[in-house]
Amino acid sequence: PEDVAEYRMWSNAFRRLADPAYASVPTVGGTTLIPMAGLGERFLREGYAVPKPLIPVSGKPMAVQATADLPATARHVFVLRREMPGLDSIETVLRATSPAVQTVVLDGPTDGQARSALLGWQADPATERAAGPLTIAACDNGGLYRPESLQALLDDPDTDVIVWVARGYPNAARHPRMYGWIACAEGSDRVTGVSVKTPLGDPARDPIITGTFTFRRGTDFARAVERMIAREARINGEYYIDTCIEDALALGLNVRTFEIDSYLCWGTPNDLHTFEYWQSCFDKWPGHPYRLEEDRHVAPNMLASLRQTYQTTLPTLPELHS
């Protein structure tokens, strides 16, 4: 049953990648912040020569692909680390994607993703920080949703913070202590609590935090993180943005979930291989609507290269010995 459920999850995801209803995102202004001060060690150990943020996903650098489904904002701020492999190449590629891209380079490691994001936000001029919402996201996943659903939540003045969540992700059921979990009021999208690295109930059905958060005001993000740090709320020695949602609640902010329809993760070599396997399969299967050329995430100039990579091959028969 689990295998069938996983197949359906991927089939639905790739149907949506080819569906025009999922082909746009809301425009909200403000800032997108992508903390990516890690070193991508798992990919290095697997022999990847390209730094993790530049590893191709559908023909585009992973860090660029991760922003494709986020609300359109006036600025994209990527938070990097000085000693990360390929720093100069990463900055060059990111800045070439858009004049709205800025990079913040930290001099060394921090005590967690939340601190890295806070430092990135603080590096933005104060006048710009005050303008528009702040969306924070990871550099190694994407999410599919109907734009009107997110727009309705963004337009609701009763929404201070949005936590992007997903249900039914197979790896969450297999490795529940790798994820953040959200508790909501019964039958509501209003968040009542967060559990980081500890599942709340049924990991196969409960919502996981995807790593994307939208704050109506960037100052609320800073207040929540600073409160979390003041109470030393570390998980495994690090400060997580997931955890600061508890502080947002304590500050009286209205926190709501936005459940995306498909969660696409490329965070580990196995995650990326799995995504590429299903992309190759569905593109080849006549009975499935997905085609590479109809996927807006696929770089047009890389289409031929992807087809070559995914070309059908016949396995070599083993030698027979009498």
Placement of each model-derived feature along the sequence:
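Conserved beta-strand segments of alpha/beta enzyme cores
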Residues: P53, A100-Q102, R190, N254-R256
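Conserved alpha/beta core of the MobA/IspD/sugar-nucleotide pyrophosphorylase nucleotidyltransferase superfamily
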Residues: E2-T32, D206-H321
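A short acidic, often aromatic-flanked loop/helix-cap motif at beta-alpha or helix-coil junctions
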Residues: V4, G108-Q113, Y169-A172, Y263-W266
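The conserved acidic donor/metal-binding loop of glycosyltransferases
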Residues: A138-G142
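A structural signal for short hydrophobic beta-strand segments in well-ordered beta-sheet cores
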Residues: L54, I182-C184, T257
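Conserved core of the sugar-phosphate nucleotidyltransferase
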Residues: G143-E232, Y310-Q311
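Conserved N-terminal catalytic core of the sugar/cofactor nucleotidyltransferase
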Residues: E2-P35, R42-A49, I55-P56, K60-I136, ...
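Alpha-helical elements of Rossmann-like donor-binding domains used by nucleotide-donor carbohydrate transfer enzymes
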Residues: L118-L119, S149-A152, C244, T274
